[in-house]
Amino acid sequence: MLMLTSQTIDGKRISRYHGIVTGDALIGANIYKDIFSGVRDVVGGRTSAYERELARARELALSSMASAAERLGADAIIGVRLDYHNLGGTMGNTILVSTTGTAVSTEDEE
């Protein structure tokens, strides 16, 4: 599934707009869990364990959105947007990764 942040696709003409598609993924960022499990891998002020979890959540959200577009018969998603929301929590933070875009069908330009 082709996914782009732009509204156009070079070499393609949009033949049909299927509508808005979304995908979401939640991850728990629990500092206590990291400390006690020994996963604290801080390099240059960054925590790679969190970065890996964010990357995994982003891929899950994008995959969910792509599946929704495929169910509509689309072959591409334009105007893709990714948002990150801190939902808080009692033992750490819960992060929501949310993706939105417009599912479209395309044809080669003549």
UniProtKB/Swiss-Prot annotation:
InterPro entries: UPF0145_dom_sf (IPR035439), UPF0145_YbjQ-like (IPR002765). HAMAP family: UPF0145. Belongs to the UPF0145 family. This is UPF0145 protein MTH_507.
